[in-house]
């Protein structure tokens, strides 16, 4: 009975979310991300023979663009007549992945009931729900971050089981690569997860099994980093001429420039412009329009 009620509830929520997708207008940057994704998708499918459109997409070397490329791929299977709605639908699916991931993490740390409550709270959070469809970056990053953390938790618990260990190594690598492939410069956000893993292995020892192997952990960590890095640069064509130096170079250029600390170029009203060109009143205006 409980499963039936849960299924009806989830179905109703998904249908309502789909209805919201149809009601939303086009955000100022949605087509820019989509066209950028298409440009890189054509480059990848042509194995590099189709050159990137550097005239239209200036300064995009600072954006690794994994999600834009993957989103563009999925929209090819949906109606081109409703391209904006198709993009929003893909965003919606990744948003639900994020919420289900939060539920699973809560279940691991507490219990199944707490997991369900967390699911509902996150879903009905107006800030998150309002971004579920229209946000082409943040919800995907949240989903990747959450699932990376979840697979790390499962790895710590099940490392002694060889089959599960390989499974979680692969999925954590893909989740990490997806996160890095959206914004490599946001890598610092993973610091709490790394700190949690360090404390769990060497101090708390609550999740890990007695058979937990430090040696295997180090080997698996190296595998995760290599796979994640290769996944990231795959969707970052501007780095393909030197995948070891250019990602770091572009990231540093994006963080430090002649005007001080911060990205030299940002997306503003659908265009890539210099940070110094943004009006000083933009933050206040932006916050005003996000008020309930």
Feature map (PLM): residue ranges:
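Loop-to-helix entry region of an early transmembrane alpha helix in multi-pass inner-membrane enzymes
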Residues: 61, 65, 69, 79-97, ...
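Transmembrane-helix motifs of polytopic, lipid-linked glycan transferases
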Residues: 89-109, 147, 151
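Transmembrane-helix signature of polytopic, membrane-embedded enzymes
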Residues: 4-9, 102-124, 143, 167
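Transmembrane signal-anchor helices characteristic of membrane glycosylation enzymes that use polyprenol
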Residues: 2-30, 38, 42-45, 179, ...
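Membrane-interface alpha helices of multi-pass inner-membrane proteins
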Residues: 19, 118, 168-183, 286
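Membrane-interface transmembrane helices that cradle and orient dolichyl/undecaprenyl
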Residues: 1, 148-168
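Short helix- or helix-capping micro-motifs
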Residues: 13, 118-123, 130, 150, ...
